[in-house]
């Protein structure tokens, strides 16, 4: 799996001023009181669909929001078997401690999501 990452906020500071400023209203709509991390993930198309591997974003009592930026046949899935197809403008919010995985796409050149960890 090949993935490009652009970090917007991490390590208690803004890493990408321009993008961070564009997202102020988005953070407000999520009711963010404190950011932990925000990053853009771009996963490259593969010939077969597979998961990237189950993981937690952190062990804090925080929330994760995954915002799907484009429509493709990839998914966000959970160990429970529950899954959400990658549809542009779809937002999934869940506890950051919940194990989840992305699934690569095979139908378009890339799967793009924004991953926000916050209180």
Residues of each region from the PLM?
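Non-heme Fe(II)/2-oxoglutarate
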Residues: 1-33, 46
